[in-house]
Amino acid sequence: MSSLVTQIDLDKINHSQSTVKDYILLMKPRVMSLVMFTGFVGMWLAPYSVHPFIAVIVLACISLGAGSAGAINMWYDRDIDSLMKRTQKRPLVRGAIEPDEALSFGLITGFFAVFFMALCVNLLASFLLLFTIFYYICIYTIWLKRRSIQNIVIGGVSGALPPVIGYAAVSNTISLESIILFLIIFIWTPPHSWALALFCNDDYKNCKVPMMPTVKGILYTKEQILIYSILLFLVSLMPFFIGMNNFIYLIIAGMLGLVFLYYSGSLFYDTPDNKQAKRLFAYSIFYLFFIFLLLSSTSTISNIS
């Protein structure tokens, strides 16, 4: 009898652990971690000090806001997620979480993220967080994603706002510095996402999402990636020229940008297995992380105390 009870208890524990893991996956933890990092850099570059406790609240609110948007995105996109190999193991597709539960979780999480940002930080940061969640869900997920080949470009606004939120949380303003942080991510998003679309082209065709390669073709997409990569190279150097970062930043950011351009150019000589597209996609993640790490470590602005 005791062994049976023990087995039942173990099953409950395993189920609870599985449920927690599924809810974490529902919030897109990889996206959350990148969003939290860029939000932190935005805070770090603001020319004011902030109490570490408030900094933790800001990062928690930004992360939960991103998780909220991710959860509602999975709720809305569960039909097409089931058609794509890349997303077939998501919690709603597997039936691990019910759609109503996912929607409720996303709405509640988003509410508390915005509420505590307003209560503990300031209204500007709270409004920007609310706008980011709204934009990702309503403008990108519901309106653009299934209708426009510019879905990633226009929809990229939401992904580029976290450092602006972080900056506003500390300074209660939007400045040229935070706008440049926004532009770096905004211009980075299309080549990053279109590189993914190149080697997931069949998936997007199956679910009829109008990504650039499926609508305009592979060659046109590669040309657009190269154009945006050139723009990214130029914008990434702006922090030095406005006195935001030092000469070390200029040198290293320039080198990172040249490598980005190399990978973008190599797409025109890609093999049928899309090896170069996969390399560009992987490098683009490293690039954004390292650029923002560089922005914080070579800053000429006094920051968090």
Curated annotation (Swiss-Prot):
It is an enzyme of class 2 (transferase). GO terms for cellular component: plasma membrane. It catalyses: heme b + (2E,6E)-farnesyl diphosphate + H2O = Fe(II)-heme o + diphosphate. Signal peptide: none annotated. Gene3D superfamilies: UbiA prenyltransferase. It comes from the Bacteria. GO terms for biological process: heme O biosynthetic process. InterPro entries: Protohaem_IX_farnesylTrfase (IPR006369), UbiA_prenyltransferase (IPR000537), UbiA_prenylTrfase_CS (IPR030470), UbiA_sf (IPR044878). Pathway: Porphyrin-containing compound metabolism; heme O biosynthesis; heme O from protoheme: step 1/1. It is a multi-pass membrane protein. HAMAP family: CyoE_CtaB. This is Protoheme IX farnesyltransferase. It comes from Rickettsia akari (strain Hartford). The lineage of its organism: Bacteria, Pseudomonadati, Pseudomonadota, Alphaproteobacteria, Rickettsiales. The gene is ctaB.
